[in-house]
Amino acid sequence: MFTGLIEDIGTLRELRIGGAQAQLSVNTGLPMTELTLGESIAVNGVCLTVTSFGDGSFTADVSPETLDCTSLGRLSRGARVNLERALRFSDRLGGHLVSGHV
């Protein structure tokens, strides 16, 4: 679940499309020490799962269905993207509850 409140504006580092899965890499100012593998991050409102991270960026796999149903497949290198990490039970609810699932 997400609040819909943007935490950071990242920059698309790379979008590799090929085969059954695409990979999206984003440069971000989010603290890398707070990220974990498998964490959910909303990229332009789309819930993605972190598959790797480090050096100020993270990578997530993107399914063909997600590319077809969202604007993620039309992004180009350097595009600015809105980022939000998933809501924790201890967080304040300053926005609205949204899921981000495709």
Predicted regions located by residue number:
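Conserved loop->alpha-helix
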Residues: M1-V102
